[in-house]
Amino acid sequence: MAGAKEIRTKIASVRNTQKITKAMEMVATSKMRKTQERMAAGRPYSETIRKVISHIAKGSIGYKHPFLIERDVKKVGYLVISTDRGLCGGLNINLFKTTLNEFKAWKDKDVSVELGLVGSKGVSFYQSIGLKVRAHITGLGDSPEMERIVGAVNEMINAYRNGEVDMVCIAYNRFENTMSQKTVIAQLLPLPKLENDELETKCSWDYLYEPNPQVLLDSLLIRYLETQVYQAVVDNLASEQAARMVAMKAATDNAGALIDELQLVYNKARQASITNELNEIVAGAAAI
């Protein structure tokens, strides 16, 4: 059995670790709430742009924007959003597993895959397995800015516009609740149709657009795609903070359980030490 002094040192070390994990849990909780607010604030904007795009596209019968036309798929581009930091449980691993299964399904159809990556964990992983990375962004921090994200988005948009890829998808972790984050893969280009499109059934009117619907549609589509990617980045960030909060809480609880076990071992060691001292005193007295 380890000595009492050694056990006390271990208990102090675990207590220090417990303080760190508890602090990280509290920080993650605060950041998660702020990110949730940012996530909720951006959704109405994104949804409204999507409805306007749908309305303009339906009103411009003679014009079909390239972003709305489906093609035969030979190459697929993926924007994969991971985290820059670890200590967030299996969040990134689940994302990587899901995307690799998706890539394998495309490969079985003789369709090649190119990547645009957000987050250093994704960059390290996908480059290590030899996948083609067209663009990547790291170091977005806890308050991501649209200007930092636009580069990777435009790279994929231009690749689609130039016929270098025939479809663009986005993969990220969607925030369901504090205990649940779901890996999502969604199609960005060509733009999927709205489900339950109310405009098609309820509205027979149209607006007058200046300078013309085509120019406006092109501008709105770019803005919409940027907004969708930004929302996914914020969603993934909320998932990261939630996963880190849960992981750090589990680490804090485990540290508490370990301290209790070590304290019990320490008490037994201390008891054994006292018993030995008493035995020595009794033996010495008997010898006298």
Swiss-Prot record:
Keywords: ATP synthesis, Cell inner membrane, Cell membrane, CF(1), Hydrogen ion transport, Ion transport, Membrane, Transport
An example Gene Ontology CC term for this record: plasma membrane
Top-level lineage group: Bacteria
Database matches in PROSITE patterns: ATPASE_GAMMA (PS00153)
Pfam families documented for this protein: ATP-synt (PF00231)
Localization, UniProt: Cell inner membrane
Topological relation to the membrane, as annotated: Peripheral membrane protein
Keyword Membrane: yes
Alphabetized GO MF terms: ATP binding; proton-transporting ATP synthase activity, rotational mechanism
InterPro entries: ATP_synth_F1_ATPase_gsu, ATP_synth_F1_gsu, ATP_synth_F1_gsu_CS
GO biological process, one term: proton motive force-driven plasma membrane ATP synthesis
Matching NCBIfam families: ATPsyn_F1gamma, PRK05621.1-1
Function text: Produces ATP from ADP in the presence of a proton gradient across the membrane. The gamma chain is believed to be important in regulating ATPase activity and the flow of protons through the CF(0) complex.
Family classification: Belongs to the ATPase gamma chain family.
Assembly with partners or alone: F-type ATPases have 2 components, CF(1) - the catalytic core - and CF(0) - the membrane proton channel. CF(1) has five subunits: alpha(3), beta(3), gamma(1), delta(1), epsilon(1). CF(0) has three main subunits: a, b and c.
Protein's name in the database: ATP synthase gamma chain
Organism of provenance: Haemophilus ducreyi (strain 35000HP / ATCC 700724)
Gene name of the record: atpG
